Amino acid sequence: MDIKSALARIVGHLDLSTEEMRDVMRQIMTGQCSEAQIGAFLMGMRMKSESIDEIVGAVSVMRELADKVELKSLDGVVDIVGTGGDGANIFNVSTASAFVLAAAGCTVAKHGNRAVSGKSGSADLLEAAGIYLNLTPTQVARCIDSLGIGFMFAQSHHSAMKHAAGPRRELGLRTLFNMLGPLTNPAGVKHQVVGVFAQALCRPLAEVLQRLGSKHVLVVHSKDGLDEFSLAAPTFVAELKNDEITEYWVEPEDLGMKSQSLHGLAVDNPQASLELIRDALGRRKTENGQKAAEMIVLNAGAALYAADHAMTLAQGVELAHDVLHTGLAWEKLQELGAFTAVFKVENEA
């Protein structure tokens, strides 16, 4: 199916099949469509609402065209990632949590990008921390094999996305592509915590990941609007495990945590996020640092469970708490900075 035929279908509020969506996405991602066609397609899909078949088709093409990171094994390899777009401008919880996971002995293949709507994306934060981002897939794999953690900078692995960049920027609205980032990890992880910008997406994206072969995934959105587990409100979870999807609400108290406001956790820039994380993973000298630590524990705990490193969510949170208080997570971040500095010298020689 070509994009003109797809547009005619979408205008009539009719869904595309998975194979038809694959055809259209290949045309978009290989530069065969005009910017006007891409913009119209993205807006039409948004107004119609993307079906599970369509998202599966789009994700499969993005995965197919990605510059992949080849790991020795995917057993228990985990990613913790959000769509962004929640408007809260909270510090980089998922990225901080990734270092707690690595310090706990998990293997982490973290996928992320620069901020689109927020103040600090995962790439912005890591750059502020002195971590070199422009790695080859082989170099990322070496980070993961050696340290138990590596960062895949989305724009380095999904170069075909450049064809949609102009229309996305000019539209300035959330589109299908906002959903695709967390679903297109270049290492092909089967274990994830995926935060989304709307509760209505939790079940559908869990179904998409089920269709694409994921093993244990939590797709989450909190009642106060975050694309992660919140300290201040219940969080809705669609969990894929043993090829079945269950849906439930989780309150901080269910996991041995105390509910509290998120006041003091918003940041204006990557440096502010880094300073808060440094305090949270270190000596927690400030009230905000202590609160940030608890937010990290909550989300890292969920990812330990998704990685099957813990038997239950509550056990994952308990383990994350113990690991965070060792100070090893901050050491892991510094190790990644030193390790990638060597690659920077190699790449720029």
Curated annotation (Swiss-Prot):
Disulfide bonds: none
Coiled coil: none
Keywords: Amino-acid biosynthesis, Aromatic amino acid biosynthesis, Glycosyltransferase, Magnesium, Metal-binding, Transferase, Tryptophan biosynthesis
EC number: 2.4.2.18
Cofactor section: Mg(2+)
List of residues binding anthranilate 1: G82, N113
Pathway participation: Amino-acid biosynthesis; L-tryptophan biosynthesis; L-tryptophan from chorismate: step 2/5
Class of the enzyme per the UniProt entry, highest EC level: transferase
UniProt-listed NCBIfam families: trpD (TIGR01245)
Matches recorded under HAMAP family: TrpD
UniProt protein name: Anthranilate phosphoribosyltransferase
